[in-house]
Amino acid sequence: MKKKHLVIVGVIILSAIVILGLYQTFALSGDITKDTNSYYNVTITDGTTVTVPANSTKTVYYKLTNINKGIVKYGVGYSGTNITVKYYTDTTDPVTGTVDYGKSKYIKLSVENTGTTSSTATLSTILGYENGGDLIVPSGVTLVTEKKSPLSSYITNLYNNATKTAVINNSITYQYDPKNSLMKDVGNNIRYYGASPNNYIYFNCSNYSNQSSSTCETWRIIGVFDGKIKLIRNESIGEYSWDNKNVSTGAENDYGKNDWTDARLMKLLNPGYESKTTGGSLYYNAKSGNCYSGQSNATKACNFTSTGIKNATTRNLISDTIYYLGGHNSFSVYPNQIYEKERGTTVYSGRPTEWTGKIALAYPSDYGYAADLGKCSQNLNNYNNSTCTSNNWMKAIVAPNYGWLLTPRSGIASNVWYVYSSGGVYYNSYVYNAYGVAPVLFLNSDANVKSGTGTSSDPYQISV
C-alpha cells in the first residue's frame, strides 16, 4: 500500500555561486522526484553547506523543481548554531505552499549568523502530499516562517500603515505621515521631511560587525525611490568646484562646464578615474592628493583618507543608479515643478539628460521636499524664510554656507543650481566656485538593517 503521509526529505545543499553585492549570495537548486515507495526526494548536485561569518548575513536564492506527476506541499527548514533564516518579502514564490508537476519555486532567503564566531547553516526541504495535512518538522530543524523586509520595504510600510494628513502646496495635495515624518511626492517616492526626522543611518563603516559612531559615519535617509534607499552624508566633505575647466581644457568659456557626465566633481566622487593626476576617484578610494577648486583649472590639496569611502564592503553597498540631468532656467519654482524639470529634456545645447553612476549630489527637489510643506509654503528661491529653514532637515547638511546641487541651469553653459547660505535655492553660480559637497548615493535594493530605530542616538545599522 502506498504511504499517504508526510515524508522528510534529505538535506538541501547550497551551490557556491557567489555574487558580489550587499550580501554574499548563493543559488540553491533541487529537483523533486518519486521513488518506488512513493516517497518524494530531492536530488542535489555540486553542493556544500553555507558558512556565515560572525554577525553577518548571506542571501540564498532557493530553486525547487517538481518533476513528478503530482502535487506536493513544500516548506524550508534550517539548523545551525546562532543561525536565523527568514524569507524576503520580495521573494518570487512563497516560502511554503504547493508545487505542481513540472513547476519550480524560487524562494529568496536571508541566512543570518548572530554569533561572535562563524557558523554553518544547513537548509533542508520538508515535503508532503497536497492533502496530507500540516508539514511536520523534525527535531532540531526550524521551519522558515519569519519574513525579512529590505529597509526600503520597512520604510514604505511605515508610511503605508500610518494615518495620513493632507497638506496642500502649490495646488498639489500631498499625503503626510506626521508620526514618522514621511510623505509621498508627485513621483510616488516616499521622503523624510521636517525639522528632525528619524532618518539617521550608520554607513561607510570601518567595522560593520561593530557599528557605532566611532566605527561608522552617520548619514541620513532622503527616502525610497524605485525600491532603493537614497542617502546623503550628514555633513559636507569639503568645498570644491563643481567643474572648473576653461576653454583650453574643454569648456565653452573660462567659468567651467555644467555637464555632470564630464564634471571634475563627478570624477572626484566616483570610480574609474584613478588615472587622473588631479582629483581622480580620490573620494571613492579614500586617498589624498590635489582637487579642483577655483577658476581656470585651479587646484588645492585634499585628503579623504578619513572621510572617503573606507573599504570594499561599503563600495559594494552602493548601487549604480540613473541620475537625471534635466535643467531649468527659473528658480521661482515649487518642489513639484522642479522635480518634473529634473526628469525632463530641457538642457543647455548638447548636454546629456541623464547619467548612470554611483555617487552624485542632491537634486533641488530633494532639498525642497525635505521641508515641511505644511509650514513652508514658499517657492525654492524663498526658502531662506526662517520658517522654511527651521523645518528643513537638509539645510544644515547641504548649506551651512553654500552647497552644490546636481541640476544644471539650462540657459547658460556654466551655471548649476545650489543652496545659498541663507537657505534659498538659486541657479546663477558659476561652477568653478568652491562650494560645499554632500555626497548622495543609493543603496542596493536588498539593503537590510539589523538594528536601530533611526534616531540620532540609535541610527539604523546595515546588515552585511
Task: Describe each PLM feature range.
Residues 5-15, 19-22, 43, 123, ...:
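Long, domain-scale functional regions
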Residues 27, 103-142:
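C-terminal, structured domain-capping segment
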Residues 36, 69-82, 123-128:
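Short acidic, flexible loop segments centered on an aromatic residue
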Residues 47, 51-57, 101-104:
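Solvent-exposed, conformationally flexible loop/turn segments
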Residues 54-68, 107-110:
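Short beta-strand elements of extracellular/lumenal beta-sandwich folds
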